[in-house]
Amino acid sequence: MQGNAIIEYPVDQTTLTQRYTEKSIELIKQNKEQPFFLMISHHLPHIPIYVSKPFQNKYEDPYANAICEIDDSVGQIINALKSLELDENTIVVFTSDNGPNQTFEPTGGTAYPLKGSKFFASEGGQKVPAIFWCPNKIKKGSISGLGSTLDFFNTFISLTGSKDINITAQDSHDLSPVLYHGSNSPRSDFFYFSSFIPPRGEIYAVRKGDWKAHFFTSHEPHFSSPDSIEKHPSPLLYNLKEDPGETYNLAEKYPNILQSLIEYSENFSTKLEIAPDRYSKKILSQERPEWAQ
């Protein structure tokens, strides 16, 4: 689709990545004389995995082929910025929305040595790469501080110098000092929720600094059913600095730390405003465009 127009049906998924890339470069060229914002949400490596012919036999693993084509796409876009002399005045961010999907092993990828995958509150489902690139403005290096895609909102407002925008998100932190000066991350905590499996609005896990407590876990990939969810009367406690794979439950050894995380979460819960269930009959019955019927 392009806007509300169906441009191809059924779609040839083997050409999607290259077409997204070509369209992105076209938009960059059209807006090279003015500030622009371009968000590219590639389908790959989400299932089903289809790659274009040049990448179909790069590796034995289809997932690896998909990643290889994504890498090529990023390279084409970076080269376009360089050829247009926009690279030193453009901020490029590369990241992902979640960890691999282990329901579809082996084509879903792996988060090893982290535990879990997509839809899990464990690190394998949540920890993803985040690369910021802008020559002469962002210095080369790596940072291990805590950050979230939630922080992109306030960070982008700061990076673009948009002083006329007086809107900020309460759950977003400005990471620009981290990027420009190597400062410590202003984010020290993160709360984990499930968007569609009950209990909605409950905190599934919380991280504060190096410590993380799990109030709910699932013994099945995808939190596939309410029956797969286990509520822990005594939450699980992990030190992510020493144990990033969340293997050793330290709840009995550090009861005071666990209690502080419980109280921290309870206090946060009192400030929550739960949004309507996006799958409720009320939401689904709202008028939608013809193509979405």
Stretches with model-predicted labels:
Residues 4-6, 22-66, 101, 108, ...:
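Active-site His/acidic residue clusters
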Residues 48-50, 60, 66, 79-137, ...:
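Histidine-centered active-site microenvironments of extracellular/periplasmic hydrolases
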Residues 35-41, 67, 74, 81, ...:
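Beta-strand elements within well-structured catalytic alpha/beta cores of enzymes
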Residues 39-48, 94-100, 171-172, 194-197, ...:
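Short, solvent-exposed turn/loop segments enriched in Gly/Ser/Thr/Pro and often Arg
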Residues 100-112, 116-121, 138, 142-145, ...:
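C-terminal cap/loop subdomain of S1 sulfatases and analogous C-terminal strand-loop tails that border
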Residues 1-11:
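Short glycine/proline- and acidic residue-enriched helix-loop micro-motifs
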Residues 31-38, 86-92, 127, 185-188, ...:
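Loop/turn elements at helix/coil->beta-strand transitions in domains of secreted/extracellular proteins
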Residues 25-29, 78, 82, 153-157, ...:
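Non-transmembrane alpha-helical segments in soluble domains
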